[in-house]
Amino acid sequence: MRAPSIFRSVLTLTSLSVGLSFAGVCAQAQDIGVDVGGAAGIFRPKNPEAKKRTNRPSPVVRRGSASRTTGATNAAVEDRIEDLLDKGNQFRDARRFAEAEAAYQSILKLKANSGRAAYGLGNIYSDQQRWEEAEAAYRNAAQWSPSDVDALVALSVVLVQPRTGAGNAKRFADAEAFARRAVQLEPKNAIAWDRLGVALQARGLFNNETEHAYRRAVELDPQFPVAYAHLARVLNRMGRRDEAQPLYERATQLAKDPATLNVIAESLQAEQQWQNSEPVLKRTLELDGKNPTALYLMGRMLVVFKRYRESEPYLKLATEVSPRAFQPFNLLGRTYLALNRFEEAEVTYERAAAFASPGDRKQLAGIYGFEGVGDGYMKAKKKPSAARAYQRALELDPGNKELEQRLAGAH
């Protein structure tokens, strides 16, 4: 059975916590489904289905016929909802996210518990890596439409996107629970089985159950490249590398679209096979030159190899394509920091701060953020600029004694 169309394999930028040392860069990729946002396979959920309208004859409203009037009104509202769903879907496909959001939000004003509208909102937030908003929207969709497997799987995907700070353990456990519900509802759904494997990996479980979930996915759909890549990853982690390599090769052979290629590249990077990810990402960008995940992963790989000038155009374009995503701005700022372009680093970090979670804000205050910018200004003997950067760092991380000392030294 082919993988259901719950998700067209694709991308959206992953939320990766990249530990980079500019003196000797060491990118620490975490497990699939953890830092790689389900490296997983981040999929692009399909659009909510807009029902085909039927040409209903307008009922004749007679005096005193309140029920007929109500029926006509309800029918008009339902037609309006279908129109808005269709518009939202079209805007999303065109990456006109603000207009898509407005369309889906308009549905909720007409029908407050519309699972399809909530699911549509989750999709566009996920496309833009607005993970907290995506989670809230998908949770509404799962609550209002509890048997909607699309919503359950999409929610499981978003929940494995790691966020700096507390709460990841509960989200990963929830991701597993929602994936299990999806498998129970549709036991022959290959993608749901794959997502169950990803959720288990997010919890650090590289065991027989995780392997079984992925093997079930490839049994149900032998043409499912993402599941092959995930199975290869778990076998690698279980020390069965000879079994893993042919599966990576099979995944690459089957991959025909940018999304699937991104998943393979993410998995290779998570295994520290940075160099092997480059040709895969080049294939992706040949197919879709503005694919935000591929742009980010290419920039990330180049930074790992200290090829900062080469990484800049990829990361800049990633910020243009996904202007509300934290990680591309954050890594672009680090790139400028490595190039000693402190003014540009400062501006870029400021833009990242607008989308940063509480945990991310503390990260931005640190050595690979405004503190690093301040240090750079100090070395360049630009004390007023250094003081400004340290002050901004303190605003992001109040009470940090080291930052207070650095600020005092800059005055």
What are these regions (language model features)?
Residues 27-66:
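N-terminal propeptides/low-complexity segments immediately following signal peptides
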Residues 117, 151, 192, 227, ...:
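TPR alpha-solenoid repeat register
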Residues 110, 144, 185, 220, ...:
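Structural marker of alpha-solenoid helical repeat scaffolds
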Residues 77-110, 123-127, 164-168, 198, ...:
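Alpha-helical segment of the N-proximal tetratricopeptide repeat
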Residues 80, 114, 148, 189, ...:
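Residue-level recognition of tetratricopeptide repeat
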Residues 95-102, 106, 127-140, 163-181, ...:
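Structural signature of tandem alpha-helical TPR/SEL1-like repeats
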Residues 86, 120, 154, 195, ...:
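Canonical tetratricopeptide repeat
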